[in-house]
Amino acid sequence: MYINTLFWKQNPTGDKKNQEEKMQKTLLSCLITTLLLITVADSMKDTSVRLKLAHRDTLLPKPLSRIEDVIGADQKRHSLISRKRNSTVGVKMDLGSGIDYGTAQYFTEIRVGTPAKKFRVVVDTGSELTWVNCRYRARGKDNRRVFRADESKSFKTVGCLTQTCKVDLMNLFSLTTCPTPSTPCSYDYRYADGSAAQGVFAKETITVGLTNGRMARLPGHLIGCSSSFTGQSFQGADGVLGLAFSDFSFTSTATSLYGAKFSYCLVDHLSNKNVSNYLIFGSSRSTKTAFRRTTPLDLTRIPPFYAINVIGISLGYDMLDIPSQVWDATSGGGTILDSGTSLTLLADAAYKQVVTGLARYLVELKRVKPEGVPIEYCFSFTSGFNVSKLPQLTFHLKGGARFEPHRKSYLVDAAPGVKCLGFVSAGTPATNVIGNIMQQNYLWEFDLMASTLSFAPSACT
C-alpha cells in the first residue's frame, strides 16, 4: 500500500450545482492493494481459487478535500518503502472498485473462522499481513462488522514466547511484550502511508470459493485480530488481504496449494460496486487464451513488492531522456506494481520528462489549480477536447515487452470539469510505483514459479 488518491466520478445529468454535489460524493482513492483466496487439501483437483474484486471508492462518498489527504498518504507510503506445486484448481474472488465507499482501493470479500463470517477487505499487493476488525476477548458495540474470536472454533493465538513471534514475525511488526507465557503475540502493524493496525496474531481458517464453483477451507492461515486501526487506507473496509511476496501472505498460502500463479483484472476505478472482476489463484482460462506480453518479475530486488525491470518511457514514437539509474534498483531506483497505490509515482527525473511531455499536447486547455488537489498538472477540461490527441504513453520493459496504458489511465478526472495528469513526483532517488489506475483494464498474471509478469488489455468482464 503505497499511495492513496481521490478522483471525481462525472455525472452527466442534472444542473451544475447538483452535479458538483454528486461528484463530491464519489471520490476515488488508492486501491490497493490486497487479494482473497480459498484453499483446502480435500478439494485440490481441477480447481482454482476465484475472488471478486471491487474498487474501494464504490463504497462511501467523500468530499474533495480528501484528495489532499490521500496524496499525502501516498507520499508517506512511498517514503517507507515459490511455490512449486501446480494444480488445475484455483481460488476465485470477486474484485471491484471502492468508489461507492469513497476510496480508490479495490475490495474483495473473505470468510473467516468456524463458522465462517464474511468480511470486506482491501486487496493489497504491498502488504504481508491479512487482518480483520476483531475482538479477542473484549466485548463492546461496533459500528462495523467485527470478528469475535471466542465464537470461532478454529481460532488459535500465536504465543508471545514462541520463535514465530520473537523472530519470524518481526517484519510484521510483532511486539516484545510478553507478561505471561499464555499471552498472545501482539503487533503494531505500520503502513507507509501512516495507517496502522494493532492486535494479536492467530492461526485461523479462511473459506474461499473455487473456480469449479465449490467452496474450500484454508486452515491454519496466519491472520491479525485487529482490535484497533487508524488511517484512510481502511475507509469502508473490515480489514486487509495481504498479497505481498512473503511467507505469511495470503498469496503464499493459496499458491502453495493451487499453483504458483495469481491474476487479476482491475475494472475502471470509476465503476460502481455492481461491476466487478475476479482475483484468481491458480489456473485461469482467461490468462491461457488472452494475447499476452511477458517480462521478468523480480521477487527479490525490492521485497516484499513485485518489481519489474522498466528500461524507459516513450510518448508516441519519442523515447524520453530519462537517466538509466532511475530504473536501477541497486541505485535506489527500480519499479514496482502496487494495487494499494492509486496514482503512479515516478522518480523526479522521469516525472518531469513525462508530465512536461504530455502537457505540450494540452496547451489549448487552461491550466488550473483546483483547491485541495495536490497534483501539479491539472486542466480545465471541455467536452470539445479529443483525448486521442494525447500521445500513447509506453513503459518499455526488459525482454522487449511494452505496457501501453489507456489514455484515461494517465489523464484522470480530479474535480468537476477538471482533469489532471495522474502522476506524482517520488523524489530522488526513489522507487517508481505503477499504481492501480494505470493498471486498470488490463489482465495481469504473476507467475511466481517462472518469475514472470504477463499482461494484456482487457475489458475485465
From Swiss-Prot:
Induction: Expressed with a pronounced diurnal rhythm characterized by a peak at the end of the day and early night (at protein level). Slightly induced by sucrose (Suc). Residues 106-456 form the Peptidase A1 domain. SUPFAM superfamilies: Acid proteases. It comes from Arabidopsis thaliana (Mouse-ear cress). Its main location: plastid. The active site is at D124, D338. Its EC number is 3.4.23.-. This is Aspartic proteinase NANA, chloroplast. The keyword Cell cycle does not apply. One of its GO terms (molecular function) is aspartic-type endopeptidase activity. The gene is NANA. CDD domains: pepsin_A_like_plant. GO terms for biological process: carbohydrate metabolic process; chloroplast-nucleus signaling pathway; circadian rhythm; proteolysis; response to sucrose. One of its GO terms (cellular component) is chloroplast. Aspartic proteinase that can use azocasein as substrate and regulates endogenous sugar levels (e.g. sucrose, glucose and fructose) by modulating starch accumulation and remobilization. Influences general morphology and development. The lineage of its organism: Eukaryota, Viridiplantae, Streptophyta, Embryophyta, Tracheophyta. Repressed by pepstatin A. Optimum pH is 6. It is found in: Plastid, Chloroplast. Glycans are attached at N86, N274, N386.
